[in-house]
A protein has these predicted regions:
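Glycine-rich, proline-tolerant flexible connector loops at the mouths of alpha/beta enzymes
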Residues: 13-29
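Conserved, mostly hydrophobic/aromatic
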Residues: 2, 10, 35, 75, ...
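Surface-exposed, active-site-proximal loop segments in enzymatic domains
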Residues: 19-22, 48-66, 91-105, 184-193
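Acidic, His- and aromatic-enriched active-site or binding-groove loops in soluble protein domains
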Residues: 68-70, 101-133, 238-252
Length: 255
């Protein structure tokens, strides 16, 4: 079916490999061979996940970067030259609904800022969360609190911090009994880390992996923050032109 609509390349990853572990050359080659057996090509890796400890500069950062370099080298040996990654703390792309219905009968991913604010203020109960929203938005949150059901609350939690993050080897999995508690702990890892500190951690990471990219001709492609504004009190890394300009000059390398 994909070939029938003109698709030539596939964007995928080794989703079964835990975040931070090495992608074995054999596993990469096996998936590549499978894709090519259907007359397609593995064009882009999305994503080779960057571990949280790399982002917040934890004590295991250097070992995790070494693992990342080995994975990059193995991708290069398999002939895969484009790797997408992101440097968003804790939470990657955010949606409040994975199957939002539309009038024509179709459905799509959806981000509802009021429902997200409800998650932040009422469910997560993040300290100082109210400062990130307007008076009108907070009023809408209070109105939502009068009608939202427990099932809808549970689905909102599941969507924001389990289902969407599972696509990118998230830290919280299906079946975890206390996802909100785990999520709060992950957020706390970034206490005291501002935009400048996150930038320096990204620079450190890129400087470390560029020699491997040079050797194998791999291009590292960063995914912009999604959505491109501050969420949950976390620093952001690629929200607009100024961030992109910083990134292009932070590491002097074409890859």
């Amino acid at each position: 079916m994909l070939r029938q609509i003109g698709v030539e390349g596939i964007v995928t990853a080794l989703h079964d490999v835990p975040n931070g572990e090495i992608w074995a050359l054999e596993a990469i080659q096996s998936l590549k061979d499978y894709i090519e057996s259907h007359q397609l090509r593995w064009s882009v890796v999305e994503s080779l996940p960057v571990s949280e400890a790399i982002k917040y500069a934890g004590p295991e950062r250097d070992q995790l970067i070494e693992n990342y370099k080995v994975s990059l080298a193995n991708l290069g040996k398999a002939g895969i030259k484009t790797v997408c990654y992101n440097f968003m703390p804790v939470i990657d792309w955010i949606r409040t609904d994975l199957e939002h219905p539309w009038e024509d009968g179709t459905s799509s991913l959806y981000f509802d800022k009021i429902r997200f604010a409800y998650f932040d203020c009422m469910i997560l109960q993040r300290e100082g969360a109210e400062k990130d929203y307007t008076d009108l938005e907070l009023q809408q949150v209070r109105e939502l609190d009068k009608t939202i059901t427990e099932a809808e609350k549970n689905e909102l939690v599941d969507t924001i911090i389990v289902k969407t993050q599972g696509f990118v080897n998230g830290n919280i999995k299906e079946g975890d009994r206390h996802p909100v508690t785990i999520f709060r702990r992950l957020l706390s890892l970034y206490d005291g880390i501002d935009r400048d500190a996150l930038r320096e951690n990204l620079r450190y990471f890129l400087q470390a992996v560029m020699p491997v990219c040079d050797e194998y001709g791999i291009n590292m492609c960063i995914h912009p923050d999604d959505p491109p504004f501050q969420v949950l009190g976390l620093p952001r890394i690629v929200t607009g032109e100024e961030d992109i300009n910083w990134l292009l000059h932070a590491v002097d390398n074409p890859h």
